[in-house]
Structures are given as structure tokens and as C-alpha cells.
Amino acid sequence: MAHRALSIAPPDVQALDIDFYAFSAHKLFGPTGLGALYGKAQRLAEMVPWQGGGKMLTAVNFEGFAPQAVPWCFEAGTPNVAGVIGLSAALQWLNGIDLVAAERWSSNLAAVAEARLAAALPGFVSYRASGSSLLAFNVAGVHHSDVVTLLAESGVSVRAGQHCAQPLLAALGVSGTLRASFAPYNTQDDVDALVAAMTTAITILAD
């Protein structure tokens, strides 16, 4: 999960001699539908655009096309301007906080939520890794999709499903999980809201 590391401990791509590094904006608390690819100049120069499009070409004819120089030859058409502005704002915000302290805060909230949910909900099963700010869990006897619907009605946003990790879930023997992802802007009030909404949801689904 290299792209997730950017909001925790950004890598030194030169010290690590990284050829390519891809990340998505929403993992940095930016807008969805946007990503970026870092590449060494040498590696990018070795690549050939697999298709042509507006703004990435210097010439086009019936035999083919001539691409712009690197990196302009790899992005065709009108860019996602609003998304880029949003990502820029997110990066400025991240650059202004202590990332180590922020991750410690987030993981502490996840640990508190895990303990409180375990105490409040019979059949609670956690899949959280030690020190992680991501809390994946299930409650025996209820389906994660039903739970997430009720949580949304209470104004609590979590994810439900396979989280792009089907092999892991298969190894765990579950069809999906709920996932509460804690971030630097979350507070104890959010933990309270999650526990209250989960308690209500399980009570409703148990009837």
C-alpha cells in the first residue's frame, strides 16, 4: 500500500532509487477520481505512449502521430483541473501537520473504537492490525451491508464490502467486513457516534 504511506511517512524516492511511484488523491484526503504517477526521467523517456490524444501530440497524420516530450506525452485531453486544485490543497494541509503525530492520533482512535465496540457488541470480531488506524470488523449474525446502511442513516460513514482485498478476506473466511478508517481530523466524538450507531444498528437487526 505504497500510496497509503504518503499520508504517514512519505518515501524519499531518490534515496530508495524508485523507478515509479503511483498514488491516488483520495488516500491523501483529496478528491476522488484523480491519481498521479512519479517516474524517473530515464524510465519515462524509455516508454512509448500507448495511444494518442489532445494536447499530447505535436503532429497527427493517417500513418501515426508524433508525441510531445516527456512528461506531456502521457496525459491526453482536458485534465481534471478541479481535482488537481483539490489535491494541491490537501497536500498543503498535510505539509502543515506532524504526520507522525497525526498517525499516532488516528491509530489511538481506532484502538479506542475497537475496545469500545468489543465491549458493547456480543459477537464483535476485529481484523485490525496492531497500530493501524484502519479498523476492519464484523459482528456475528448480521451482514455488513445491512449494518452500513443503518450507519449511513445515522450520519456515520464507514465502508462495507471486500475493500479490494478479496484474497485476504478469502483467507479469513469472510465475505466482507465493515471498515472504519480514522484520520487526523477525527475526534473522540466520532468514536462515540460510531459506537452509538453500531449499538442501535445491531439492536435493530437482531429483532
Where are these regions (language model features)?
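Pyridoxal 5′-phosphate
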Residues: 1-207
